[in-house]
Every structure is written in structure tokens, then in C-alpha cells.
A protein has these predicted regions:
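A short, Lys/Arg-rich alpha-helix, primarily the initiator
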Residues: 1-23, 27
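Recognition helix of helix-turn-helix/homeodomain-like DNA-binding domains
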Residues: 29-45
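DNA major-groove recognition helix of helix-turn-helix/homeodomain DNA-binding modules
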Residues: 47-67
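Signal-transducing coiled-coil/dimerization helices and immediately adjacent hinge/linker segments
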Residues: 83-90, 260-338
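Regulatory sensory and allosteric helical modules in signal-transduction proteins
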Residues: 140-201
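Helix-to-coil/beta transition segments that act as allosteric "coupling" elements at the rims
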Residues: 178, 187, 198-225
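Regulatory loop-to-helix N-cap segments in sensory/regulatory domains
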Residues: 231-246, 264
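Allosteric cytosolic regulatory segments
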Residues: 247-254
Length: 338
């Protein structure tokens, strides 16, 4: 075999054997087609993925493959990448300690904000240590009227790394339903992974500007309170070990919610909603509506807490948006939600 000029050329030679391609894909935790996209430079692997590739490739190629990768990735180091990989595989002990301390020592009305902030920060540090571009959102079930079903989710927390940090912080007030990956994960009751949007078979779950997306329901005793959404601007970004990590974080996010915020599966019947752009006008008056409700409640001598007024406004807006006819594009399915 002539000496390969790049790690992509060498990998192309290795995976020319279909069985070896499948073996490598299984060992790395990616789709076999992902390896082909690496070879053709259609997709950029993470350092952690390259480390796994070097470790599991045929022994006769490992040294050359490592050297070729280092030529293209100047900051690539097997030692550093191994550290990144190990750090990304499990929730750190100190995160568990911090969350339990919040639950034990702080007022209940601060639990959601403090716990969600701690967990989102820890997730970003683990899932995107090199600031590639990852966004995280927590979308809670919108509280339904008595005896009614949950029809939508709404964003209650999140953050991101550039360039998704600004987008995540801006997209605070809007509703999603069954048309979103987050809503679909809640409906089916399990983690969903879309690792390459361009070739995916579920166009109605695509997200504008996003190449990889994960959504995991936040559950307790079989009931659901929210969906944890994690997205990246890179295709094939999330390894199998990181899907397990995201599930672990979703279990911890459940500690941020109160008992009454969880709903039995039969009470969750998500509907399709207009896209975020069409919702902006409605939500531009969100805070104004909250203040009006609180003022009326005070005049009626039945004052409301801010959270109670916000719940009522979410319900009002949900009802209004469910009555809005979907556009042709929305009915056919391309959405822009996390």
C-alpha cells in the first residue's frame, strides 16, 4: 500500500472493507456513513472521536494514523484527547454534590433556577469543551387547565456556546409541540437522536442552522415534566457515551421540578404549533399580560405570584396559537425548534 498523504486517505483505505467499516463505527459509536463523510471531508469529527478511531483501528495503522491526524490538527494530542474523552463520559461527582446541596439548603422557590443553571453550565463544559457550538434548552410541559391534557412545551431555561449562545438566550418565550424533536421525545417517552440533519428521514424535526440534535424527556416515576434539548452546529457531533451522559443529566434536571409539574403519559397530548417566527407577535406582549393579570388580581383582593400569573399567560397564548391555522410549510413539516 502506498503511504497515505492524510488521515482521511488512510481511513478510506481501512474502511474499504465493509466489515471493518462496521466494526470501527460500532467501536467509535457513530453511524458507518459518518466514517465515509469523514473520508470525503463532508463532516468534521470531534477530537474525542479521533482518539477512539486511533485506539480501535487495526494496530498496523494506529501510529501512522495518529501522526497524520496531528499534521492536520495542530492541537491534537492523544493525552489531551484522552482527558477530554474521560471527562465527557460521566456526570462529575461535584455536580451531584452541588445539586443535592441546593435541594437541602435553599428555599424551594429557588430550586429550579439554581439547579438548572448548575446543570446546564456543567453540561456545556463537558459536551463542548472547545466551544464548537452547542445549545441546551429545558422545555417544560405547559400547565393545562383542570382536567385537560398537556398540549405544548415552553422554554424555561438553557444556554449555549458561540454561535448558539446568543440564539439560545434570545429564544426565551415560545411554545413547541409534536412538530419539534423535544415534543416528539416527550410523546414517545425516550431519548431521540438526529446526528445528520441533511440526510435524515424525519424532515419535520429538522432545525434551521443545526446539524445534530438530541432530545430526552425529563421523567420521574414514569411521569414527564419536560424535555432536555441539546443541539450542535456540527453533524455527527454526539458520541454514544454522550447520549448516556445526556440521559443522566435529564435525570438530574428532574430534581429541579416539583411533584405537581410531572404528568402521566395519558395526560400528554401534544399538538402542532405555528413556527417561532409566527409566535413572536403574540409573545411580544408576554410581560405586559403578566403585569395586567397581577394588577387585576390585586384589585380583586386575590393577589397572584409572578409564577402563577405566568402560568395563566402561557395557557392563554397556547389557546390562541392552537387556533392559528398552520401554513403549508408547517403542515408539510420543516420546523425551526430545539
Amino acid at each position: 500500500m502506498a503511504e497515505a498523504s492524510s488521515w482521511r486517505n488512510l481511513l478510506g483505505t481501512i474502511i474499504s472493507d465493509p466489515q471493518e467499516r462496521q466494526r470501527l463505527a460500532n467501536a467509535i459509536g457513530v453511524n458507518p456513513f459518518t466514517l465515509t463523510r469523514w473520508v470525503t471531508n463532508q463532516s468534521l469529527p470531534r477530537r474525542e472521536s479521533l482518539l477512539r478511531l486511533v485506539k480501535v483501528c487495526p494496530p498496523q495503522y494506529s501510529a501512522l494514523l495518529s501522526n497524520l491526524i496531528a499534521q492536520e490538527w495542530e492541537d491534537f494530542s492523544l493525552t489531551d484527547a484522552a482527558g477530554d474523552l474521560q471527562a465527557a463520559e460521566a456526570v462529575p461527582t461535584e455536580v451531584y454534590t452541588d445539586v443535592l446541596a441546593i435541594k437541602a439548603t435553599t428555599p424551594q422557590n429557588t430550586h429550579f433556577w439554581m439547579i438548572s443553571q448548575r446543570l446546564v453550565s456543567a453540561m456545556l463544559k463537558q459536551l463542548d469543551p472547545h466551544n464548537v457550538g452547542v445549545g441546551i434548552s429545558i422545555l417544560a410541559c405547559t400547565k393545562p387547565a383542570a382536567g385537560k391534557s398537556v398540549r405544548s412545551l415552553h422554554v424555561v431555561g438553557g444556554d449555549g456556546t458561540a454561535p448558539l449562545k446568543q440564539k439560545t438566550s434570545e429564544a426565551v418565550a415560545y411554545l413547541v409541540g409534536i412538530e419539534s424533536l423535544a415534543g416528539y421525545a416527550v410523546t414517545v417517552g425516550r431519548l431521540l437522536s438526529l446526528q445528520h440533519m441533511e440526510g435524515d428521514r424525519l424532515p419535520f424535526l429538522k432545525i434551521a442552522g443545526i446539524e445534530s440534535a438530541i432530545a430526552c424527556p425529563v421523567k420521574r416515576e414514569g411521569r414527564t415534566a419536560a424535555s432536555l434539548s441539546v443541539v450542535s452546529i456540527q453533524a455527527d457531533y454526539f458520541l454514544q457515551t454522550q447520549l448516556t451522559l445526556i440521559e443522566s443529566y435529564a435525570n438530574l434536571v428532574a430534581l429541579a421540578f416539583t411533584e405537581e409539574q410531572f404528568y402521566e403519559p395519558e395526560r400528554i397530548r401534544l399538538s402542532a404549533l405555528p413556527d417561532q417566527q409566527r409566535q413572536r407577535l403574540s409573545f411580544s406582549t408576554f410581560q405586559q399580560r403578566v403585569k395586567q393579570l397581577m394588577n387585576v388580581a390585586v384589585r380583586n383582593q386575590h393577589p397572584l405570584k409572578v409564577t402563577e400569573a405566568e402560568e395563566q399567560v402561557w395557557q392563554q397564548l397556547e389557546g390562541e396559537l392552537l387556533d392559528v391555522p398552520l401554513s403549508t410549510e408547517e403542515e408539510s413539516g420543516t420546523k425551526v425548534y430545539p
